[in-house]
Amino acid sequence: MGIQPSPVLLASLGVGLLTLLGLALGTYLVRRSRRPQVTLQDPDEKYLLRLLDKTTVSHNTRRFRFALPTAHHILGLPVGKHVYLSARIDGSLVIRPYTPVTSDEDQGYVDLVIKVYLKGVHPKFPEGGKMSQYLDSLKIGDMVEFRGPSGLLSYAGKGNFNIQPNKKSPPELRVAKKLGMIAGGTGITPMLQLIRAILKVPEDPTQCFLLFANQTERDIILREDLEELQAQYPNRFKLWFTLDSPPEDWTYSKGFVTADMIQEHLPAPAEDVLLLLCGPPPMVQLACHPNLDKLGYSQKMRFTY
């Protein structure tokens, strides 16, 4: 007849097992409670966010801070994606895409840097920008509709880009060791999002090259952020500017984006090179693409936001 374990021993083992299970469950629940909650749960849903703060960045640019549902929420926006803001303005529904300058490391709020296009300033756009003027008119506490994540590109890290040819197509993997970027005006925001995401990871080998076009020196938004990153990561991030109307002491390029500028300041065409474009349609269609064609960049090497 075998030795039977005593009831006391069995009870002790049971208590010990329950204690371990309780500790494991407690640890899981604590970790789960500390995990930030995601705001953008469904890309087809609209989320009302409250305006927290509005600050002046430059003569025509504002930084808008919106509150997320709680102080422990993150926006939930993958790198490379953007959001849509929608509002009914003068009886019409207006929808515009924006890329935040904050990331999912920031909890409780999301920041947008937006250039305000006022009425009567630009002869080609006498009414100005509907959405930017609407946002500028908001009072602290007003609500705005956000929707996302949206976009055909996302960054998975270490040079891995998932790019959809169109909305209905599955993403295709594109691996780049060198990332060239041409931005115009507020087209800098998706570029800055990517640059920050790449540079903050020491193991990410991707090199970034940015050509940033603006009309005047005071139109350069987020310049301090860019120059700080360049100084901090001189071997991983190269920065160059061009202005339509530069001051006399300007040491960068002058005029529209040219083939020479691209050749001098961006990586040459290669299988491991990806070029991203974001800016006013005339700049992208009339200055960038024809010059990229001339220099031998294939369509596979380019992505236009």
Curated annotation (Swiss-Prot):
Chain segments annotated as transmembrane: 8-28
EC code: 1.6.2.2
Any one GO molecular function term: cytochrome-b5 reductase activity, acting on NAD(P)H
Q: By its UniProt entry, which PROSITE patterns does this protein fall under?
A: FAD_FR
Give residues annotated as binding FAD.
136-166, 175-210
Q: Which GO terms describe its biological process?
A: sterol biosynthetic process
The subcellular localization recorded is: Membrane
Give the top-rank taxon of the lineage listed in the UniProt record for this protein: Eukaryota
- What cofactor does its activity depend on? FAD
Q: Its GO CC terms?
A: cytosol; endoplasmic reticulum membrane; mitochondrion
Question: Which EC class, in a word?
Answer: oxidoreductase
Q: Identify the keywords attached in UniProt to this record, alphabetized.
A: FAD, Flavoprotein, Lipid biosynthesis, Lipid metabolism, Membrane, NAD, Oxidoreductase, Steroid biosynthesis, Steroid metabolism, Sterol biosynthesis, Sterol metabolism, Transmembrane, Transmembrane helix
Q: Which reaction does it catalyse?
A: 2 Fe(III)-[cytochrome b5] + NADH = 2 Fe(II)-[cytochrome b5] + NAD(+) + H(+)
- Primary localization class, coarse: membrane
Domain FAD-binding FR-type, by residue range, is 44-156
Q: Does the keyword Protease apply?
A: no
As for membrane topology, the entry says: Single-pass membrane protein
Q: What does this protein do?
A: NADH-cytochrome b5 reductases are involved in desaturation and elongation of fatty acids, cholesterol biosynthesis, drug metabolism, and, in erythrocyte, methemoglobin reduction.
What PANTHER family would the database entry show?
Answer: NADH-CYTOCHROME B5 REDUCTASE, NADH-CYTOCHROME B5 REDUCTASE 1
- Similarity remark: Belongs to the flavoprotein pyridine nucleotide cytochrome reductase family.
Tell me the protein's name.
NADH-cytochrome b5 reductase 1
This protein's species is: Mus musculus (Mouse)
